[in-house]
């Protein structure tokens, strides 16, 4: 059985989030949660919340062994960017793109 959770429009850069997501792909859920809990950056906290949500979704399914769940796949897609301007010298302005992410975590029952 598979369980999934999605968080959309999260205010974290997709590029930085993918760096953290690669670390938990294929790990048992308990190990992935420990890794994310002690990773000191913002994407780790967001991924931790999505992973907890996927685990809670798995607990709602009958006949699923939550202790044997493994992170099957983590997908981080780019969401819309917020466009902002930063004032610069001599009346100029520079564009800033505040990027957002769509994060999907898929859990599956597997071998540890």
UniProtKB/Swiss-Prot annotation:
- UniProt keyword Ribosomal protein present: yes
One Pfam family, short name:
Ribosomal_L22
Q: What CDD domains does the record point to?
A: Ribosomal_L22
* PROSITE patterns the record matches: RIBOSOMAL_L22
**Residues annotated as signal peptide:** none
Which terms under GO biological process does the entry name?
translation
Molecular function GO labels: rRNA binding; structural constituent of ribosome
Q: Which family does it belong to?
A: Belongs to the universal ribosomal protein uL22 family.
Cross-referenced NCBIfam families: rplV_bact
Q: How does it assemble?
A: Part of the 50S ribosomal subunit.
User: Any idea what this protein is called?
Assistant: Large ribosomal subunit protein uL22
Which organism does this record belong to? Nitratidesulfovibrio vulgaris (strain ATCC 29579 / DSM 644 / CCUG 34227 / NCIMB 8303 / VKM B-1760 / Hildenborough) (Desulfovibrio vulgaris)
């Amino acid at each position: 059985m598979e369980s999934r959770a999605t968080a959309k429009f999260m205010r974290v850069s997709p590029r930085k989030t993918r760096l953290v997501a690669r670390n938990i792909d294929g790990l048992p859920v308990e190990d992935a949660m420990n890794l994310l809990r002690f990773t000191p950056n913002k994407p780790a906290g967001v991924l931790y919340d999505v992973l907890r949500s996927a685990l809670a979704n798995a607990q709602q399914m009958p006949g699923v062994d939550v202790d044997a769940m493994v992170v099957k796949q983590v997908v981080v897609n780019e969401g819309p960017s917020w466009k902002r301007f930063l004032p610069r010298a001599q009346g100029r302005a520079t564009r800033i793109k505040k990027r957002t992410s769509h994060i999907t975590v898929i859990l599956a029952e597997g071998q540890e």
